[in-house]
């Protein structure tokens, strides 16, 4: 909190302005000397209002004269003065920032920005101004093609710690930091910086553009890492955005990507639940081919990959997710084949406790050696339990039990059997009683 002024210097400052010579290069030094002496008196008297006017007058004097070197020197000097009033210094920085759009010489502009960043470094009361100056300097470096310097300048600014920074502007700043990391293909740091943003912020209606920008960057990171489940979730978040729902063409495109990445995600409980929720969306009716494909993965029935490729191949390959002649697209197409085979193995495991390798290969449309290799990979990843007897070429999907487990299962089966016998006994007794009653009535 600023101190109350001991003396009001506003009238004296008005008199000083009248006494100063016209603003020209000859009189600048004399005028500046008078102003600096007066500024010290005002500052020591804690007259914030007049002090602010004096500081701005000094800056204007040098700016109009085109003495940018003198302006830079005075800014540094004024900030080092003992007992400077925070409100006055904040106003000075804000005022000098208004000069920047009118400076045509790029070197002069950069020097002034650097000076302002230097004097605001570590000062909480001008942290917002420093952040904006940093962003401006970064933009200049980026326009010059120096992406590395632009990224280093912008990303070294810890805006997440700036309490006085407007939250919307803060999020936009962080997203700009992430964008520069992505331009340099630094996906690890880009992912780290996105974690500084709380996604609950995007629940507000007036930040939908920032939400779309955020998830666009998250999708790029997820695609680079082949994190299909994460990418699917990001697309669902975009799909649920009001501005996307208002555009039929847009939400159809996004929903198509949601389905594609849900199918690419390796099977687990979360993926299964996600597929069922997607299938329950009535808007999926507008994509009948993908709706059929989703149902193929939900029902407990075998799918033949050659048939899947024949029916859905042209539609899927036209999507950028499975684009032909693209390394990532070809990889995802191969991954989709794996998901189909994994689904088929789970179906087989539900119906068979033991099966011959050659028979499983026929069901999966794979050679015995390829079947064995694929099965070994899935077992190693703990997708399900299976044991291969190589000499006999038999695969067992039933997990072997120890003595205790066998005893527990036997006990459970006996209990279930006795329960059923008791129910049958009761039904027989009931039937006998009904029969005896009918005979008694007949007599």
From Swiss-Prot:
Residues the record lists as Phosphoserine modifications: 209
Domain PCI: 230-402
One Pfam entry name: PCI
Main location: nucleus
GO cellular component, one term: cytosol
InterPro entries cross-referenced by the UniProt entry: PCI_dom, PSMD12-CSN4-like_N, PSMD12/CSN4, RPN5_C, WH-like_DNA-bd_sf, WH_DNA-bd_sf
Compartments where found: Nucleus
Claim: Nucleus is one of the keywords in the record: yes
UniProt keyword terms in alphabetical order: Nucleus, Phosphoprotein, Proteasome
Disulfide bond positions: none
PANTHER family: 26S PROTEASOME NON-ATPASE REGULATORY SUBUNIT 12, 26S PROTEASOME NON-ATPASE REGULATORY SUBUNIT 12/COP9 SIGNALOSOME COMPLEX SUBUNIT 4
Family to which this protein belongs: Belongs to the proteasome subunit p55 family.
Role noted for this protein: Acts as a regulatory subunit of the 26S proteasome which is involved in the ATP-dependent degradation of ubiquitinated proteins. Required for proper proteasome assembly.
Name assigned to this protein: 26S proteasome regulatory subunit rpn501
Organism: Schizosaccharomyces pombe (strain 972 / ATCC 24843) (Fission yeast)
Gene: rpn501
